[in-house]
Design a protein with these regions (language model features):
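Bacterial N-terminal signal peptides that target proteins for export
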Residues: 1-10
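Short, structured beta-strand/loop micro-motifs enriched in basic residues and often containing a Trp
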Residues: 67-77
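Sec/Tat signal peptide C-region and signal peptidase I cleavage site
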Residues: 20-24
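Bacterial N-terminal signal peptides
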Residues: 9-19
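Sequence context surrounding c-type heme c attachment/ligation sites in exported
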Residues: 25-30, 37, 41-65, 83-172
């Protein structure tokens, strides 16, 4: 049986989108109120699982992850209109899973164990020193350590300064 590239992509996206149980514990309603990221104070937004799909991503070794990026309505409107910089109130959420081979179809990769929920929040006044963005990286619903958060803005600044510090583009 021949599978088209778009068919494989659709299968991957459906697998990622249906992986809700892996991240159920990461939603704000299940995390303590104090579960805010160091430096930025970002929390996992309530209801993010209902937000629109922005794009998939794949991270090579050493992380070896499958990722999906979701955007709130403010992000989606900006992306659809190619608006830069993103307006205040824009929020991206990236969900990541370990990539594992499919047991049903060898060439395909499917989501394995959930690894992180990563959040970017645009507030140009509050996050003036980081290009207007606050960052949060969460593992099992809890913020990652300070050291991980200290690298967020530097990485975005070095690579995507000309795209309002955002790597993600709207998938066609």
């Amino acid at each position: 049986v021949k599978c088209s590239r778009s068919g494989l992509a659709a299968t991957l996206l459906l697998s990622l989108a249906s992986a809700t149980p892996s991240f159920a514990a990461n939603e704000t309603r299940d995390a303590p109120a104090q579960a805010a990221s160091p430096i930025y104070g970002v929390t996992i937004p309530h209801g993010y699982r209902t937000w629109q799909f922005v794009a998939p991503a794949e991270e090579a070794d050493p992380l070896d992850e499958l990722r999906i990026v979701l955007g709130n309505p403010t992000v989606m409107k900006a992306l659809e209109k190619n608006t830069l910089p993103f307006p205040d109130g824009s929020i991206f959420v990236k969900l990541a899973w370990k990539r594992v081979p499919s047991t049903e179809f060898g060439p395909a990769s499917v989501p394995g164990a959930a690894t992180t929920v990563q959040v970017m929040v645009k507030d140009s006044k509050r996050y003036r020193d980081s290009g207007g963005w606050g960052f949060g990286r969460f593992i099992n619903g809890q913020p990652a350590d300070l050291a991980q958060h200290q690298t967020c803005f530097a990485c975005h600044q070095a690579r995507v300064r000309n795209h309002d510090f955002v790597f993600t583009r709207l998938a066609p």
